[in-house]
Amino acid sequence: VIDAFDPKLLSILGEGVDVIIDGTDNFETRFYVNDLAQKYRIPWIYGSCVGSCGVSFPIIPGETPCLRCLIGHLPAYHATCDTAGIIAPAVQMTAAYETTEALKLLSGEKPRDSVAVFDIWQGEHHFIKAGKMKNKDCPSCGGHPVYPALQSQSSADVLCGRDTVQIRHPGAFELENMAREMKAGGAAVEYNGYLMITALEGHRTVLFPDGRMLIHGTKDKREARSLYQKYFQ
């Protein structure tokens, strides 16, 4: 399917599905998938990787923690495939974990109840029990779910007369941590406690704690959203 992504399209694609395998490259889309899977009780296999590292976990609505529960327990990396690269074996290992769990589900076998975390370069594989990660107040899988990803999404608006696109992130930005990690990666960053300024592929970019992001030097929403997804998803 070639189309602009939105929750309505995802809901149509989700009809009659037995299991969803994560092949996405950003968390905005993953949270949509997570909430759709919770709402319609569809098992899905989360998987992501960057560099030589990867993570995978089978999410079963009503039984396991969902992605929103897990995210606070997983390593907080702002690196992406665009900023840090990725080696093919990490992709292949992540896909192997995901497809194995999908085959278990489709054949009636019980999937594992632990999060697989690996660094294939170092030869390290760990399995972390996930049961205690479940949040009873989670807005996606708790006692009173509201499925926030299906209600809100990042928006992009061209600012009149300023050759600038404003992106509004669904949540807040942790600017201090982001500035520190981007500096460690060699990026030129200014941070003063109130905002962060950097450059993304030649575009001066300003980020605010409330989730607003200004990308200067363009009026193209598609280009601005692409930069946002590359560096801050």
Predicted regions mapped to residue ranges:
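Conserved SAM/SAH-binding loop
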Residues: 1-8
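Conserved residues at beta->alpha junctions
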Residues: 4, 24, 218
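Glycine-rich phosphate/adenylate-binding loop
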Residues: 9-19, 23-170, 175-180, 189-194
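A structural detector for beta-sheet-dominated domains
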Residues: 121, 168-170, 198, 208, ...
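Residues that form generic nucleotide/phosphate-binding pockets
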Residues: 178-185, 227-230
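Cytosolic Rossmann-like ligand/nucleotide-binding regulatory domains
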Residues: 185-209
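Generic C-terminus detector
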Residues: 201-233
